[in-house]
Design a protein with these regions (language model features):
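Beta-strand-centric surfaces of beta-sandwich/beta-rich domains
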Residues: 1-159
Length: 159
């Protein structure tokens, strides 16, 4: 079943090349539970986008129970794509005040310009899989010392 977790009008850091977690989803700590990342979207939320390069990454924290998962400012509830579907057991968060400290290597990384939007989709057989008690983060970093306001989402598939 597909769910969307989104954030809207969040400011990036004003420090060049400083990655921060704008959005994250955590798999339940239940045996056999996992989800796939099916797509991400990131774009400028300002009325007049400027010519600003932005780095985007998707990363995983391997084991949230070991600590280092960070602290989200906003708790988010995944919204089902099927209005008659069940609720998700995934928990989400945005705009971390304490960054996760145990991210592994990026599963996806791309440079973009805020005058454009980024949409990345994965086929089910190619999608990154997040296993039990793992945290999947969508991180961004401005490439100049200027904070910008962005919005975005991730679509996840529980299975």
């Amino acid at each position: 079943m597909l769910f969307t977790i989104s954030f809207d009008n969040l400011a990036t850091e004003a420090t060049a090349d400083a990655f921060e977690t704008m959005l994250a989803a955590r798999a339940a700590d239940t045996a056999g539970y996992r989800f796939r990342l099916r797509s991400i979207a990131v774009g400028c939320a300002e009325d007049s986008p400027v010519d600003l390069p932005l780095a985007v990454q998707v990363r995983i924290v391997d084991d949230v129970s070991d600590g280092g998962a960070g602290t989200a400012t906003n708790a988010l509830t995944p919204e089902p794509h099927d209005s008659l579907g069940r609720a998700s057991v995934i928990t989400g968060g945005s705009k971390y005040t304490a960054e996760p400290t145990t991210y592994g290597d990026p599963l996806f990384a791309l440079e973009m310009n805020l005058r454009a939007s980024l949409i990345k989709e994965w086929a089910p057989e190619d999608a990154p899989v997040v296993n039990r008690d793992q945290l999947l983060g969508l991180l961004v970093a401005p490439r100049t010392s200027a904070a910008r306001t962005i919005s975005g989402c991730m679509v996840i598939e529980e299975f």
